[in-house]
Structures are given as C-alpha cells and as structure tokens.
A protein has these predicted regions:
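Conserved alpha-helix/loop element of class I SAM-dependent methyltransferases that forms part
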Residues: 24-43, 58
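Short glycine-dipeptide loop
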Residues: 42, 137-142
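A short acidic, Gly/Pro-enriched loop at the edge of an enzyme's catalytic core
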Residues: 102-113
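A short glycine-rich, Lys/Arg-flanked "PGG" loop and its adjoining helix->strand segment in the class I
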Residues: 127-139
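C-terminal alpha-helical "lid/dimerization" subdomain adjacent to the S-adenosyl-L-methionine
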Residues: 10-23, 142-198
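A short SAM/SAH-binding and catalytic strip from SAM-dependent methyltransferases
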Residues: 113-125
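Class I SAM-dependent methyltransferase SAM/SAH-binding core
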Residues: 44-103
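A generic alpha-to-beta junction signature in SAM-dependent methyltransferases
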Residues: 37-39, 62-63, 88, 137
Length: 201
C-alpha cells in the first residue's frame, strides 16, 4: 500500500502521520467551508469521515452548547480524533465512533447538522450513504460537503490514479445524488478548486 492510500483509510504508522498532516493541510478549506454553515449554538452535529478530529474541534467551538459526534471507519482516525477532542469528550459534549457512513447506528432524525470534509471521494456507494445521512438528519437540518477538489482540474485525474477507490465528483453530480436522496435547497459554492455544498432535509 502506498503512503497516499492512507488518505482513504489511515492504517499503522503511516496512517498516524497522514491524519496529523490532514489536520493541518485541510484547515484552510475547512475554515472556508464552515462559513456557509449556520449551526445553532446548541446544535447536535455529526462529522462523517472525521479523520484527525480537527473539524470536530472547530464544530465544538461553533456550537459551544452543542454536542458533536464523529464517525470514521479507520481505527487510527478514531484514536486521533479522540485525542484531539479529549477535553470535550470528558465534558460529555463529544464522542467518536468507528463505523461506516453507509450503515450508521444513530436514530432517525437525530442530528441538526451533518458535515463531510474531504471524505465523500471515498464513500463506496454514494447514493446509499447520502440516504443514510438523510435518515439521521432532522427535518430542516443541513448537510454540508466540503472538498478541496471539484473535478474541474487536470490534477484530479492524477490523484484518482494514485489513490485506489477515490472518485472526485463534480458539483452537478453531487447535486443529483443529493436530490435523489431527498435533499432540497442544494447550494453550491466554489473558490478556485474548492467546493462546498449545503443541502437541506
């Protein structure tokens, strides 16, 4: 397995290095994307594919009276997210679970906000995953997707060749999948190669 495969599912020592790098490397696009998220101070938030936990920490700050949960199928990512958010976990405001977005343990209509930063590239069955996100999101809730790559760059093909199981979607493709899952009010924001999409249930 190449080092870059750790972007999909971090494992072992290389995975630990990768999640630390992602926390730093993805910070600019994450901060940009979060400006399009109107979350209440007491919101219940889920971060799908939470990686190294940096975005969970940002969401906890954005929702100071809320609860933020994270889910990731990589044990390395779960461990790192728990370390990064140790204080909030001790306060009962945060939890990190290992699992798949395609089959989540959460109850229907549970979260006010769900986020997915730099992760939908790797979801194996995107329509199914979007339906599952829709299921656990409250009516009126917001789903935010934030990607560094929007499918319009020649470099995108290079990344999909290096990283197995990676698909870089264009905004129009994601919009169709979201609407098929039941979402509406799909809004698309772009900055250079960056893409942020918000959708309502």
């Amino acid at each position: 397995m190449s080092f870059f495969e750790n972007t999909r599912k971090p494992v072992g020592f290389g995975g630990k290095i990768m999640v630390a790098m992602m926390n730093v490397g993805h910070s600019a696009v994450a901060r940009w994307g979060l400006q399009f998220l109107n979350a209440a101070p007491d919101a219940k938030v889920l971060d799908c594919g939470c990686g190294g936990g940096a975005n969970m920490k940002r969401l906890l700050k954005k929702c100071p009276r809320g609860v933020v949960k994270g889910i990731d199928y990589s044990p390395v990512s779960v461990e790192k997210s728990q370390k990064v958010n140790k204080a909030a976990i001790a306060e009962g405001r945060c939890a990190v679970l290992q699992g798949s977005v395609a089959d989540m343990v959460f109850a229907d209509d549970w979260f006010d906000t769900i986020t997915a930063f730099e992760t939908v590239y790797f979801w194996p069955d995107l329509p199914r995953c979007f339906r599952e996100v829709y299921r656990v999101l409250k009516p009126g809730g917001t789903f935010l997707i934030c990607n560094e790559s929007n499918g319009d760059s020649d470099r995108d093909e290079r990344w999909t060749e290096i990283i197995g199981g990676m698909t870089i979607y264009k905004d129009a493709e994601l919009k169709v999948y979201l609407e098929q899952a039941g979402f509406h009010e799909v809004q698309i924001h772009k900055k250079k190669s960056w893409l942020c999409i918000t959708a309502r249930k």
